[in-house]
Design a protein with these regions (language model features):
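Phosphate-binding glycine-rich loop
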Residues: 56-98, 116
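Conserved PLP-anchoring active-site segment centered on the Schiff-base-forming lysine
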Residues: 90-112, 124-126
Length: 351
């Protein structure tokens, strides 16, 4: 049975969230002399002399309305990497506890475990990059504090089967974190819609992919108010900058632009997949619910990778054993996709 309070590290249970004098003031202050800021303004071109809202209230309100949740169910972070690290720190005691990962998958779960001196238990995905019945049973039986499930998965691109995730949610005693960094490209409802059913569910999303805002570093976590309240206890006071909050609000006010880009990338994925399928050096293109295509090349993916680099085309070469012989190809703008395909055809001719 899931019991959040018993999972939280004892030292965190007694912590209180950061509070400033401005939290005690209601309304709009006429004179602010509490935080030792520079009241004369900024040395740069814009007015950033005041600290940002540490609670990111305006952004959370806009996101809550967009996602259909309460603002108290939203946590914002300096990229998803920060909230992954915070979740590990929230529950797992250094040198004592463990977390779960399902490779091949996003590498930051392993990094967060190592940084926090927490053991990493790995339950490998099956050959089709799905959770097997045996894998699900191992996850449920584990005494780990957290299981991270990346869906759509990076670097494989596929959604994990919803029934498998639901089994883990119903059986695992710790937090189940579903990382939906690429969820906007998938034809499936977000797990945010299931938060009311599962108090042990945390859903991660990001502004870095479909929103096209990787440079502002803004991640999102959606969970029960209780989980979010604990995260607020341990985050740094001003973890999301004023500039990031302004840019996020501007993006959230123009969801039409977001949807247009999303549709263009989905069409680009389809077009790129069709072009790759015609190339003899392409052995297999794995099904993708993301903005990239994991592609197996023959006879030598490494040679293809080096050929592309020599022509100024940078793709990702997965390092995990289950992805041997593959390259991860991001769906770019049409001109970038065309350049990629042309370079691959050139490799065939040269070979």
């Amino acid at each position: 049975m899931f019991d959040l309070d018993s999972l939280i590290r004892p030292n965190v249970r007694v912590m209180k969230p950061y509070s400033s004098a401005r939290d005690e003031f209601q309304g709009e202050a006429r004179v602010m002399l509490d935080a030792n800021e520079n009241s004369l303004g900024s040395a740069g071109p814009a007015e950033f002399n005041r600290y940002p809202d540490p609670h990111q209230r305006a952004v959370k309100q806009a996101l809550a309305q967009l996602k259909g949740v309460a603002p108290e169910q939203v946590f914002l972070s300096n990229g998803s990497d920060e909230v992954i690290d915070l979740l590990v720190r929230l529950l797992a005691r250094p040198g004592q506890d463990s977390i779960l990962s399902t490779p091949p998958t996003f590498g930051m779960y392993e990094v967060a475990a190592a940084l926090n001196d927490v053991a990493l238990e790995c339950v490998e995905l099956a050959a089709d990059y799905q959770l097997s019945d045996e894998g699900i049973a191992r996850l449920i039986a584990s005494k780990a504090k957290i299981v991270f499930l990346c869906s759509p998965n990076n670097p494989t691109g596929n959604l994990l089967r919803p029934a498998a995730i639901e089994q883990v949610l119903r059986g695992f005693a710790g937090l189940v974190v579903v990382d939906e960094a690429y969820g906007d490209f998938a034809d499936q409802p977000s797990w945010i819609t299931r938060l009311a059913e599962f108090e042990n569910l945390v859903v991660l999303q990001t502004f870095s992919k479909a929103w096209g805002l990787a440079g502002i570093r803004l991640g999102m976590a959606f969970a029960s108010p209780a989980v979010i309240a604990y995260l607020n206890r341990i985050k740094m006071p001003y973890n999301v900058s004023e500039n990031t909050q302004r840019l996020a609000l501007a993006a959230l006010a123009d969801t039409g632009r977001f949807e247009a880009m999303r549709q263009e990338l989905l069409q680009g994925r389809e077009t790129l997949q069709a072009a790759l399928a015609e190339l003899p050096i392409v052995d297999h293109i794995f099904p993708s619910d993301a903005n990239f295509l994991l592609t197996r090349f023959v006879p030598d993916a490494g040679a293809v990778y080096r050929h592309l680099l020599e022509r100024g085309i940078v793709v990702r070469r997965p390092s995990q054993a289950a992805c041997a012989g593959t390259l991860r190809l991001t769906v770019g703008a049409a001109v970038e996709n065309d350049a990629l395909v042309a370079a691959l055809r050139e490799f065939e001719v040269a070979g």
